[in-house]
């Protein structure tokens, strides 16, 4: 059912994800770790996202849910949010894959997306 943790193994961008029987414990650990941080930075939000995507807790829709969580967390912590548009998808997936070795790929991709979002805010004269 929608919202239930996955029952079958799945993958993202060629990466293995948590086994269905590991999901509940891994999600609990991830949320405990993340919520222990009082103020979240841009990097904290990206790090949470990478870990969430590696768990891939749901059968489908994990990417959308994960990116929506990033958007919400940016708003919550007064960080300009961003949307990963199609032209950034390949860089985004590379960033997810390379996060442990090189945080710059995902960080730069998300900062590029954030710059685009700032253009929209500027156009509508919305302060940030």
Tell where the protein language model's regions lie, with residue ranges.
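FIC/Doc superfamily catalytic core
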Residues: 1-128
């Amino acid at each position: 059912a929608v919202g239930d943790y996955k029952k079958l193994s799945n993958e993202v961008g060629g990466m293995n994800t948590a086994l269905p029987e590991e999901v509940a414990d891994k999600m609990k650990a991830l949320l405990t770790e993340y919520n222990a941080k009082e103020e979240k930075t841009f990097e904290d939000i990206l790090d949470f996202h990478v870990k969430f995507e590696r768990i891939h807790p749901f059968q489908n829709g994990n990417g959308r849910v994960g990116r929506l969580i990033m958007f919400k967390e940016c708003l919550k912590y007064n960080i300009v949010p961003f949307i990963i548009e199609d032209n950034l998808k390949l860089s985004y997936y590379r960033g997810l894959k390379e996060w442990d070795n090189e945080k710059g790929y995902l960080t730069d991709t998300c900062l590029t997306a954030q710059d685009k979002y700032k253009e929209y805010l500027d156009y509508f004269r919305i302060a940030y």
